[in-house]
């Protein structure tokens, strides 16, 4: 019985490792913070991590600890609990242009034709790479704080709609919706 329990534990940890291996994580920012105490300053670290499966799921997390590896581990765990799904067109770009904001940071994301690549700065690039977007043009205006930029990017991605969901909301066919799209052809497959 004990041997079965032990073996089951190993299998569960192996399953967890396989599930974790499907995610790609990017360290966006590390910040050294100090707490002033009676004896001087006590230093710690805060980490911002973005993870994704490069197939449309992405999340971000923030972790704080006295040591850098522990802060990164906490941030990664928080990111896994904060995963969201984003509908991608052809598995490589956004369905439409979108804007997002958080605090004083604003971001504008534009769908791009194949071969454009990721044209985005800093923290936004990490989000797109882990999400699996290959072609996008992004611009950030206002705050360049990495936390605000990541949260503004997630705010924008939260509002991305696939043609299928828009058609369902409007009670029309997907082909009708795509035929109306400027410069689009009606043969594009909706996700």
From Swiss-Prot:
Q: Tell me the disulfide pairings in this chain.
A: none
Keyword Ribonucleoprotein listed? The answer is yes
Identify the Pfam families for this entry. Ribosomal_S5, Ribosomal_S5_C
Please tell me whether the keyword Ribosomal protein is annotated for this protein: yes
User: Which GO CC annotations does the UniProt entry carry?
Assistant: small ribosomal subunit
Gene Ontology annotations of biological process type: translation
Region entry Disordered: which residue ranges?
1-20
Please name the GO terms that the record assigns under molecular function: rRNA binding; structural constituent of ribosome
Question: Sorted alphabetically, which keywords does the UniProt record give?
Answer: Ribonucleoprotein, Ribosomal protein, RNA-binding, rRNA-binding
Question: What PROSITE patterns does the record point to?
Answer: RIBOSOMAL_S5, S5_DSRBD
InterPro entries according to UniProt:
Ribosomal_Su5_D2-typ_SF, Ribosomal_uS5, Ribosomal_uS5_bac-type, Ribosomal_uS5_C, Ribosomal_uS5_N, Ribosomal_uS5_N_CS, Ribsml_uS5_D2-typ_fold_subgr
Entries under Gene3D superfamilies matching the protein: 3.30.160.20, 3.30.230.10
Q: Which residues form the S5 DRBM domain?
A: 23-86
Source species, domain of life? Bacteria
Subunit architecture: Part of the 30S ribosomal subunit. Contacts proteins S4 and S8.
Cited function: With S4 and S12 plays an important role in translational accuracy.
Give the record's family classification: Belongs to the universal ribosomal protein uS5 family.
Under the heading PANTHER family, the entry gives:
MITOCHONDRIAL RIBOSOMAL PROTEIN S5
HAMAP family, per database record: Ribosomal_uS5_B (MF_01307_B)
What the entry says about domains is: The N-terminal domain interacts with the head of the 30S subunit; the C-terminal domain interacts with the body and contacts protein S4. The interaction surface between S4 and S5 is involved in control of translational fidelity.
Name this polypeptide is given: Small ribosomal subunit protein uS5
User: Can you name the source organism?
Assistant: Rhodopseudomonas palustris (strain HaA2)
Query: What lineage is on file?
Result: Bacteria, Pseudomonadati, Pseudomonadota, Alphaproteobacteria, Hyphomicrobiales
- Name of the gene this protein is made from: rpsE
């Amino acid at each position: 019985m004990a041997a079965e329990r032990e073996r089951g534990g190993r299998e569960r940890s192996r399953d967890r490792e396989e599930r974790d291996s499907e995610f790609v994580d990017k360290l966006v920012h590390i910040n050294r913070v100090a707490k002033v105490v009676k004896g001087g300053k006590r230093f710690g670290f805060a980490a911002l991590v973005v993870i994704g499966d490069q197939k449309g799921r992405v999340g971000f997390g923030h972790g704080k600890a006295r040591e850098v590896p522990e802060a990164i581990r906490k941030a990664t765990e928080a990111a896994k609990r904060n995963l969201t799904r984003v509908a991608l067109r052809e598995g490589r770009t956004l369905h439409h242009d979108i804007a997002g904001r958080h605090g004083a940071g604003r971001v504008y994301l534009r769908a791009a034709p194949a071969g454009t690549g990721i044209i985005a700065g800093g923290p936004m690039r990490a989000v797109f790479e882990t999400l699996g977007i290959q072609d996008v043009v992004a611009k950030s205006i206002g705050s360049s704080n990495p936390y605000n930029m990541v949260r503004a990017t997630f705010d924008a991605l939260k509002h991305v709609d696939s043609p299928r969901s828009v058609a369902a909301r409007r009670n029309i066919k997907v082909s009708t919706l795509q035929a109306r799209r400027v410069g689009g052809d009606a043969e594009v497959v909706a996700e």
